[in-house]
Amino acid sequence: MAKRPDIFLDTSALFAGVWSDSGGARQILKLAEAGVVGVCVSPQVLSEMENNLRQKAPDLLGKLAVLLDRIGLRLAETAPPTRYEAALALIGHPGDARVLADSWEFGVDYFVTLDRQHFLEKRELHVGLPFRLGTPGDFLLWYRQNYIEKNT
């Protein structure tokens, strides 16, 4: 059987997984809790997530901590300047380039986001990266096709 895929969740995807008890992002967290996928985020994502929850839903901070513990979250290290510059050349936005570079350096199999403007609608990202990029639903379809159907 193939190794479990490593998934990077950006802030939008992680927020959706914590905010809603259903939906694709929450399904990814459930897969991680079951140990069939690995989830990582960057320090920037954790910081943004905490700030967003403090502003929009402070009562969910405890839920975030419990979920992150249950899924065995791994923290991607800050990528070196050369990787950051390569990501910046692809995406053009410094904050998003940092997140992209950190996931790239970690060696993820899939980058999950709900950010259409900066990630999903940039075609050059889909061909310029060594990993897939898509929505939670896109990832779940890819996972089913590449891990479930191939092993049944």
Give, region by region, the residue ranges found by the protein language model.
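PIN/NYN-family metal-dependent endoribonuclease catalytic core
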Residues: 8-9, 19-55
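Active-site neighborhoods of divalent-metal-dependent phosphate/nucleic-acid chemistry enzymes
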Residues: 74-116, 120, 124
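Intrinsically disordered, low-complexity and often Lys/Arg-enriched segments
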Residues: 1-5, 150-152
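Conserved beta-strand segments of alpha/beta enzyme cores
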Residues: 38, 72-74, 130-132
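Acidic, PIN/NYN-like endoribonuclease modules and their adjacent C-terminal/linker elements
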Residues: 46, 109-110, 116-152
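Domain-scale selection of a single, long terminal region
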Residues: 43, 47-85, 99
